Amino acid sequence: MTVELPEGYKPSPKEEYMSPMHLEYFRQKLLAWRAELLQESENTISHLKEENWQEPDINDRATLETDAALELRTRDRYRKLVNKIDSALSRIADGSYGYCDDTGEEIGLSRLEARPIATLTVEAQEKHERLEKQRRDD
């Protein structure tokens, strides 16, 4: 079932939570973000291929290598984000999108608007982070 969104549509708390319109809105948002990240990754690859790695000056070469390492770390971060976006798109397809993995409660439109790949409510995320911090401190 394809839902056509009105131009400028934003999900409203007055609507049924995770209605077909909500799901289509977030699906489109995630797909656009995914496309943007993939384009950035392509740009990084192109840039690295075009770079002159035979820079005669050792300082210039060191700068190039540092910049390349930073670009590759960013690309790796993008790859991980694309995986999370793909997971979110799968949750939209199976009907579990928008609900907390831990509690089953609604994550909330404002949180999903800010972080459409969120899998936990704010409270569950805070609890998770506290537990992680305790494990690191032990």
Predicted feature residues:
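Interaction interfaces in information-processing and related assembly proteins
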Residues: M1-D94, L131-E132, D137-D138
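Amphipathic alpha-helical recognition patches that constitute DNA-binding helices
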Residues: Y25, D102, P116
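Cys/His-coordinated zinc-binding microdomains
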Residues: L30, G104, Q125
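Residues immediately within or flanking Cys/His clusters that coordinate Zn2+
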Residues: R79, Y97, A118
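Short cysteine-rich clusters marking metal-coordination/redox-active sites
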Residues: C100-T103, T121
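Short functional micro-motifs and their immediate structural scaffolds
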Residues: I107-G108, E129
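Short Cys/His-rich "knuckle" micro-motifs
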Residues: S110-A114
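Cysteine-rich micro-motifs
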Residues: A118-Q125
